[in-house]
């Protein structure tokens, strides 16, 4: 049984973007798209999936065989008792689970207790000044380091700014 991969970090730091990049990496390496289940709980399409039971039903309806599945759950904190269904998926399905969500809810008391030893946390941080400058230069935003420092002080290292 694989550990649940938990991406945490402040709002807008790039967790959802990173989750999508991880999924794309699997696809580029030949993982079957039909065996990837992706749910963004901030998408109205999934508005009715707000309980562990409904999430369990939805995911199990998507599974068609015993091959390995990848399950990507973005903003999982919108699902009540999500920690129970994650533990169930991990115990009963041939899958690898990746989740994102609010720092304050993902690894708080109840989830931490139910999933202790079953998950690994990856703390996602906004870009540092050096990372922001390197990326800005790579995409053609030519500024001197001093000019960019003013920009960085105003906007920070959040990926959306690019």
List the predicted regions and their residue ranges.
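Phosphate-binding site recognition
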Residues: 1-162
